[in-house]
Amino acid sequence: MRALIPESDSRPADVLVPRYTNGKDTCIDVTVINSCRLDLLLRSSEEPGYALNHVFNSKWSKHGAACERAGMVFLPLAFDTFGAIHPQGVDFIKKLGKSVARSTCQEDSECVSQLFQRLSILLVKGNVSLLLNRRPDIQVP
């Protein structure tokens, strides 16, 4: 969303949740990283979570301080193409699941579990779509 930060054209939020964190607006920047990217591959193979931390820190350095100065909370919601989620993202998803549970009169654990399952299905669908669109053309004799 543009124009969230005065005198800036940056877009720190894919999703803006009003008054979500201690009464402050929360800017959620959803990002998916491929840990097999050539510039990340070696470190990712040696250090679990390296790609997630890399993209989280990159997003934070780009938007975090500006959001704080504007009185907002910034959360880079970082996912790996293989299904890993940055620890702060896991905490956010659990909090979101508990909020849904309260509003629907369900058990917290049930809503949190369903939310993670839905995210997992979306990731698998996205990966399958990428694979199917990259398959080589088959020449029929």
What label would you give each PLM region?
Residues M1-A13, T21-T26, V32-P141:
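Non-catalytic C-terminal interaction segments of nucleic acid-processing enzymes
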